């Protein structure tokens, strides 16, 4: 459905209730999020680790497989191995990662990136989702499935490191834009690459140094965008504010 952006296997972005819910994004349910689907697979494995009921987890494995299938069939729009987003209509969200404000994805100069956009953290989520599904496969007696997903994760990580690392700056690009140009701003998204494990071991120390620098660390949290970037504004929604989940 192009209005709600629903696709097979895709996890919804939000559910709105109330008399005017359909007036916002075309309906009470909206699927325009590029990150919710791999995060669902990660969450299922995390629930299993914390002792979720075996039968419930087993019953959700087909949904996890459908989510991973969405990533390759619909999320990867141009077969380059990365998950990208671009809204299907002029009613949807322009940006569909967690920084979903219209100006949330921009270059170091402040220029706004044009979609389709492949976010660094979303590639990390997909990497972690593949490993999560491999872990579940091992737990439920599916060794061949586990090997397949681990191989896919390793291939994604290699592609990511080749395409996103900016050696002259010492951080990963925030994203790749419509022309596959690295969006070179220094942002908190970088930290998600550490969390998911997609970052290379040899990059970890310099990334930690960048994130703990004065331009990123406000003293009470990480800024969403470094003070040295062209679009920095401490009062903005995603271009300098501090979000607790970061």
What spans do the regions from the language model cover?
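Short secondary-structure capping/junction motifs at helix and strand boundaries
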Residues: 48-62, 76-83
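Extended glycan-interaction surfaces of carbohydrate-active proteins
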Residues: 1-30, 77-118, 155-245
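C-terminal transactivation domains of fungal Zn(2)-Cys(6)
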Residues: 114-120, 124, 128-159, 170-171, ...
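Well-ordered alpha-helical scaffold segments within catalytic/enzyme domains
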Residues: 24-26, 39-56, 70, 122-143, ...
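Single, functionally critical "micro-switch" positions that shape active/binding sites
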Residues: 34, 52, 169
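Hydrophobic core segments within long, regular secondary-structure runs in both alpha-
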Residues: 1, 41, 45-48, 58-72, ...
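Aromatic- and histidine-enriched alpha-helix N-cap/loop-to-helix transition segments
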Residues: 31-42, 59-63, 117-128, 185-188, ...
């Amino acid at each position: 459905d192009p209005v709600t952006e629903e696709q097979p296997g895709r996890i919804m972005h939000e559910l709105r209730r109330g008399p005017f819910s359909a007036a916002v994004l075309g309906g009470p349910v909206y699927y325009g999020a590029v990150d919710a689907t791999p995060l669902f697979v990660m969450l299922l494995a995390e629930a299993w680790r914390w002792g979720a009921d075996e039968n419930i987890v087993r019953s959700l494995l087909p949904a996890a497989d459908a989510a991973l299938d969405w990533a390759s069939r619909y999320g990867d729009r141009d077969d380059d191995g990365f998950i990208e987003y671009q809204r299907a209509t002029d009613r949807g969200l322009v940006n569909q990662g967690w920084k979903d404000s219209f100006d949330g994805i921009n270059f170091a100069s402040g220029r706004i990136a044009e979609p389709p956009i492949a976010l660094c953290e979303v590639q990390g989520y997909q990497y972690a989702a593949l490993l999560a599904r491999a872990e579940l496969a091992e737990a439920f007696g599916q060794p061949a499935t586990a090997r397949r997903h681990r191989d896919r994760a390793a291939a994604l990580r290699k592609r990511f490191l080749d395409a996103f690392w900016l050696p002259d700056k010492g951080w990963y690009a925030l994203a790749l834009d419509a022309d596959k140009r690295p969006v070179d701003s220094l942002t908190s998204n970088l930290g998600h690459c550490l969390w998911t494990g997609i970052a290379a071991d040899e990059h970890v120390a310099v990334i930690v140094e960048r994130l703990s620098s004065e331009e990123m660390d406000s003293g009470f949290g990480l800024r969403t965008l470094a003070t040295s970037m062209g679009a920095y504004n401490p009062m903005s929604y995603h271009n300098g504010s501090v979000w607790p989940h970061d």
